[in-house]
């Protein structure tokens, strides 16, 4: 079984992905981490972020062992990942990695921007998570402060809006809701409420009912 979760930055899809995977005993892949890992490799190597060939080369040498590196969550790496994720050659280079992960038993939960539309268009369950940008900025700011990083909520909001525009308007795999994805508005839900709503969606789809 494959569960695809898509949505904009800081919408809560990563947390939902982890919790759904734990609930069902599936493997979980935050596909945004893949792009962050590539971005960090480029930054560490002093590479120009506009060099698509270097980005593709870094992707082909990707070591999944670094996916848990806390440095990948920094604002600098996140901003760089947002830039390089628009490169079609890079996205193509990472497709097979993601699809192989999804295909391995017993099941998988993948979250990102194009899981239900490009990576796993035949996923058993598709959820599109949204949340008000102001709420997302507040969450992202609190996360940064919890890591001991300086964060200004107004700047974070501006960055989120800029990233939304870039994600939705890029030519390669833009952020969009798949026609058969179920919308989950996470604006006014705490973590437990969001998880319960997501589980309800999965169970409804598994039972053959389409939740509106």
From Swiss-Prot:
CDD domains per UniProt: CMPK
GO MF annotation list: ATP binding; CMP kinase activity; dCMP kinase activity
GO cellular component, one term: cytoplasm
Keywords: ATP-binding, Cytoplasm, Kinase, Nucleotide-binding, Transferase
Residue numbers binding ATP: 7-15
Location of the protein in the cell: Cytoplasm
EC number: 2.7.4.25
Any Pfam family: Cytidylate_kin
Reaction catalysis annotation: CMP + ATP = CDP + ADP; dCMP + ATP = dCDP + ADP
Family: Belongs to the cytidylate kinase family. Type 1 subfamily.
NCBIfam families named among the record's database cross-references: cmk
Listed name of the protein: Cytidylate kinase
Native organism: Rhodopseudomonas palustris (strain BisB5)
């Amino acid at each position: 079984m494959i569960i695809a979760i898509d949505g904009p930055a800081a919408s809560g899809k990563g947390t939902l992905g982890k919790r759904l995977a734990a609930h069902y005993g599936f493997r979980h892949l935050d596909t945004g981490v893949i792009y962050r890992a590539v971005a960090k490799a480029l930054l560490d190597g002093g590479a120009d972020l506009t060099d698509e060939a270097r980005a593709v080369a870094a992707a082909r040498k990707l070591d999944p062992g670094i996916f848990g590196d806390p440095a990948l969550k920094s604002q600098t790496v996140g901003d760089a990942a947002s830039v390089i994720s628009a490169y079609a050659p890079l996205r193509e280079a990472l497709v097979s990695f993601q699809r192989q992960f999804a295909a391995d038993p017993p099941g998988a939960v993948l979250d990102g921007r194009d899981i239900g539309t490009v990576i796993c268009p035949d996923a058993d369950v598709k959820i599109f998570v949204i949340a008000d940008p102001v709420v997302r900025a507040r969450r992202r700011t609190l996360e940064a402060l919890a890591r001991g990083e300086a964060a200004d909520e107004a700047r974070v909001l501006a960055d989120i809006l800029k990233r939304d525009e870039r994600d939705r308007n890029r030519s390669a795999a833009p952020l969009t809701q798949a026609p058969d994805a179920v919308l989950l508005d996470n604006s006014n839900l705490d973590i437990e409420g969001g998880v319960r709503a997501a589980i309800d969606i999965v169970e409804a789809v598994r039972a053959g009912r389409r939740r509106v």
